[in-house]
Amino acid sequence: MADINKIAEELGTLTILEAADLVKLLEEKWGVSAAAPVAAAGAAAAPAEAEEEKTEFNVVLTEAGANKIAVIKAVREVKAGLGLVDAKKLVEGTPAVILEAVSKDEANAAKAKLEEAGAKVDVK
């Protein structure tokens, strides 16, 4: 254990250039690369970037709120061609997907309109 502590103390006195030279020497001697962990960390960050690049969103009505009539009207405005009965079924059957695979702008506009009517909405 004393040898390890002595090595750690000596490594602490190295300059950055000396430490870089030591890394190169150890890579050559042991046939390893210090760059491998960096590549693994970069690969782990890739899914987060892919998630940010999402282009299609679903608008989900989670709760109709107190004023169901206003929410039903808002659902009919947001989802073109939807009849009164179908809109009522969607509102009463929460959680319900109102719009699927729409752009972020369209999803946010629909969310704003539905929330203005008193509904609780998630964009996924």
Curated annotation (Swiss-Prot):
One of its GO terms (biological process) is translation. One of its GO terms (molecular function) is mRNA binding. GO terms for cellular component: cytoplasm; ribonucleoprotein complex; ribosome. It holds the Pfam family Ribosomal_L12_N. The keyword Iron does not apply. Keywords: Ribonucleoprotein, Ribosomal protein. InterPro entries: Ribosomal_bL12, Ribosomal_bL12_C, Ribosomal_bL12_C/ClpS-like, Ribosomal_bL12_oligo, Ribosomal_bL12_oligo_N_sf. Belongs to the bacterial ribosomal protein bL12 family. PANTHER family: 39S RIBOSOMAL PROTEIN L12, LARGE RIBOSOMAL SUBUNIT PROTEIN BL12M. Homodimer. Part of the ribosomal stalk of the 50S ribosomal subunit. Forms a multimeric L10(L12)X complex, where L10 forms an elongated spine to which 2 to 4 L12 dimers bind in a sequential fashion. Binds GTP-bound translation factors. Forms part of the ribosomal stalk which helps the ribosome interact with GTP-bound translation factors. Is thus essential for accurate translation. This is Large ribosomal subunit protein bL12. The gene is rplL.
